[in-house]
Amino acid sequence: MAAHSSFPIAVPQDGLDTARDVLRRTFGHADFRGLQAEVIGEILAGRSALAVLPTGGGKSLCYQIPALVRPGLGLVVSPLIALMADQVSGLQQSGVAAEKLDSNTGLDTRGDIWRRIDRGTLDLLYLSTRRLDAAFDVGAPVVPAPCTCGHR
C-alpha cells in the first residue's frame, strides 16, 4: 500500500473514530502511526489491503483492530507459534477474548475454544498453518462467518 494512494478512500469517519477508540481503550495508544489508519480504513470499508511495514511498524494492529470493531470472529493464520503466543497473551492482558490453536494445543483446550467460537464469545483466533491444514483433514468445525482475517 503506497503512502499516497491514487484511489479515493471512502471510509465512514465513524468507523475510524470507533477504531481510534479501540486503539486508545484497548491498546493505550493515542493515535495511529504511519499507514495504520489507511490500512484499517480499507479493511473497515470492506476492501482488501496489503501493508508492507517494517518490524515494529504496527502491522498487528492493522488486523487486530478491524477484528475488534467489526462483528464476528477475527481469524489470524500464522506459521510462527511463538509470535502467536506472545500476541494472544498481550491481547488477553488487554481484555481481548483471544485464543490460539496450534500443534501444542491439547484436546480439551481445543474443545473449549471451538465451544467459545460456537457461542460467539471469542474476538480473535490465532491459528497455526499446521493446525489449519489438520482441521481440513479431520473435518473440524468451520469457523463461522463473518470473519476478519489477518496475515493473509
Where are the language model's segments positioned?
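ASCE RecA-like P-loop NTPase motor cores
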Residues: 2-9, 41, 89, 93, ...
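Conserved pre-motif I regulatory segment
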Residues: 7-54
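SF2 helicase catalytic motif II
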Residues: 123, 130, 137-152
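Short hydrophobic/charged patches on amphipathic alpha-helices used for structural packing
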Residues: 40, 64, 111-114, 138
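Conserved nucleic-acid-binding Ia/Ib motif block in the N-terminal RecA-like helicase ATPase lobe
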Residues: 20, 74-76, 81-134
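Short, high-confidence coil segments that cap the C-terminus of an alpha-helix
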Residues: 46-49, 71, 122, 146
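Walker A/P-loop
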Residues: 46-65, 75-78
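Conserved catalytic network of the ASCE P-loop NTPase/AAA+ motor domain
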Residues: 67-69, 91-93, 115-120, 140-146
